[in-house]
Amino acid sequence: MKTPLVTREGYEKLKQELNYLWREERPEVTKKVTWAASLGDRSENADYQYNKKRLREIDRRVRYLTKCMENLKIVDYSPQQEGKVFFGAWVEIENDDGVTHRFRIVGYDEIFGRKDYISIDSPMARALLKKEVGDLAVVNTPAGEASWYVNAIEYVKP
């Protein structure tokens, strides 16, 4: 289940992607398809086939973003969150072996292309919610339970 939450920055990036696809990339690819179609036989026309496929991919992504953005709830920073892990927090954790990780808890649609972002729906994020610095979070993993201590919590303030 995807929780329909997004940070303000994440929403703006999705909006930028939608605008880029719709106003810049789609018209450019449409011109290429039209040009390639004007050459005649489409069955062996690689330009036509490739750009037609790309146009379908763009349209699919535009439909997804449009539908997705209608349902997303933007979660802004609130001073009441300070000191505890909630949506949008940067969290630093450490295990008993001294291994540390730092990541931000964000919405599902924000995690792609970012190794330092995790989804609010992930087991790690669920285990960390409402924890404070010094608290122990136990995460169920395929290899068993893993224990992590919360070292730091930060929020991006507007």
Curated annotation (Swiss-Prot):
Keywords: DNA-binding, Transcription, Transcription regulation. GO terms for biological process: DNA-templated transcription elongation; regulation of DNA-templated transcription elongation. GO terms for molecular function: DNA binding; RNA polymerase binding. It holds the Pfam family GreA_GreB_N. Necessary for efficient RNA polymerase transcription elongation past template-encoded arresting sites. The arresting sites in DNA have the property of trapping a certain fraction of elongating RNA polymerases that pass through, resulting in locked ternary complexes. Cleavage of the nascent transcript by cleavage factors such as GreA or GreB allows the resumption of elongation from the new 3'terminus. GreB releases sequences of up to 9 nucleotides in length. Belongs to the GreA/GreB family. GreB subfamily. This is Transcription elongation factor GreB. It comes from Escherichia coli O6:H1 (strain CFT073 / ATCC 700928 / UPEC). The gene is greB.
